[in-house]
Amino acid sequence: MLSISPIVSLRRCDNEPSMPDEWRLYNLATRLRTFSNWPFTEDCACTPERMAEAGFVHCPTDNSPDVVKCFFCLKELEGWQPEDDPMDEHKKHSPSCLFIALKKKAEELTLSEFLKLDLEHMKIKMQKQMNLHIERFQAKANEVRGHLEKLDADETQ
């Protein structure tokens, strides 16, 4: 089972090709299955099909039922309106996403093209994780600095 967020997880369907969990979201049908509770389904631009085609997976929360994340660049977007075009919004908020820059479907990529694309995806994931660890470290460092300054102030009194 592949975890997208604390809320959404993906189970493999019988007809889905066997592949590592990391690669399953390249498959349009896998992304589309995450939109089972999507609030916009008819008479709008941001249908589940168009959202999945734009690379998004649906990862709702109690407070934000329309949160989506690009499986590739990891950009999260919410506050969707019925007239919002998923591909246009994706390009506007994450213009450097290589997935939306593809000129063909992921299923049509050569092995070499796919592996190069996936290498970039892994770099993005690692950078995001590294940034998260840096933020946590800086928060702890600031907390410790505050304690040290308090100790110093107590000693000088």
From Swiss-Prot:
Xref: CDD domains: BIR
BIR repeats: 31-101
Post-translational modification (record): Ubiquitination is required for centrosome-targeting.
Gene Ontology biological process: chromosome segregation; mitotic cytokinesis; mitotic spindle organization; negative regulation of apoptotic process; negative regulation of DNA-templated transcription; vasculature development
Any one Gene Ontology cellular component term annotated for this protein: nucleus
InterPro entries with a match to the protein in the record: Baculoviral_IAP, BIR_rpt
Swiss-Prot/TrEMBL keywords: Cell cycle, Cell division, Centromere, Chromosome, Chromosome partition, Cytoplasm, Cytoskeleton, Metal-binding, Mitosis, Nucleus, Phosphoprotein, Ubl conjugation, Zinc
GO MF, one example: nuclear retinoid X receptor binding
Coiled-coil zones: none
Record Gene3D superfamilies: Inhibitor Of Apoptosis Protein (2mihbC-IAP-1), Chain A
Record-listed Phosphothreonine modification sites: 47
Tissue spec: Exhibits strong and homogeneous expression in developing oocytes. In embryos, expressed in the animal hemisphere from one-cell to yolk plug stages, and highly expressed in the future brain and dorsal region of the neural tube at the neurula stage and early tail-bud stage. At tadpole stages, expression is restricted at a low level to the head region.
Compartments it resides in: Cytoplasm; Nucleus; Chromosome, Centromere; Cytoplasm, Cytoskeleton, Spindle
Principal subcellular localisation of the protein: cytoplasm
Pfam families cross-referenced by the UniProt entry: BIR
Domain of life: Eukaryota
Binding site for Zn(2+): 70, 73, 90, 97
Description of its domains: The BIR2 domain is required for vascular development.
Family from the record: Belongs to the IAP family.
Biological function: Does not appear to exhibit anti-apoptotic activity. Plays a role in increasing blood vessel size during development. Component of the chromosomal passenger complex (CPC), a complex that acts as a key regulator of mitosis. The CPC complex has essential functions at the centromere in ensuring correct chromosome alignment and segregation and is required for chromatin-induced microtubule stabilization and spindle assembly.
Complexes and interactors: Component of the CPC at least composed of survivin/birc5, incenp, cdca8/borealin and/or cdca9/dasra-A, and aurkb/aurora-B. Interacts directly with incenp (via N-terminus). Interacts with rxra; the interaction is stronger in the absence of 9-cis retinoic acids.
Protein name: Baculoviral IAP repeat-containing protein 5.2-B
Species assigned in the record: Xenopus laevis (African clawed frog)
Gene label: birc5.2-b
